[in-house]
């Protein structure tokens, strides 16, 4: 839905979020839109999670990065959601070049404060996205023929399924998922 993901003077794209939404966004930007590793930057809070991105993106911990001093990023995808949305959005505002675009993809139930002064001074554009268009869906289906993209997406698939025979099995699976917030998806196999 973006006309320009990059520009000649701002060739880089950044993603905030080392979870599954950030991973899906990063793989799509690399394998579908052709953003190379040097120009695809992923920021996260957990080094172990960032390691999954290192085959196709440059990674940085948010705690160790000077967002105000960096230049060259035209588009930022905020994929953190939850309590981290506010800091990620404001770090994105600090990072992004003038006339840049910030896409909000992370979901939070709370209102977040943003640095509107810098949004106005830089002339930034914000948009929200949680659904794909027909054209994007068609691009995705075509991209699935790429074996490297398939392999990258397999990183989200868990090794085991939860076998659900009754409501106590379902409760156990949900409690376990909530207690261990890894970024792989939870698969439930119902035997009802």
PLM-predicted stretches and their roles:
Residues 1-66:
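Mid-domain Rossmann-like dinucleotide-binding core that forms the NAD(H)/NADP(H) cofactor-binding site
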Residues 34-35, 97-98, 182:
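Short conserved AdoMet
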Residues 65, 90, 134-192:
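C-terminal hydrophobic helical "lid"/dimerization subdomain
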Residues 84-152, 190-192:
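Glycine-rich phosphate-binding loop and adjacent beta-alpha segment
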Residues 67-76:
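A short acidic, Gly/Pro-enriched loop at the edge of an enzyme's catalytic core
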Residues 77-78, 104:
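Redox-cofactor binding/interface segments in oxidoreductases and associated redox assembly factors
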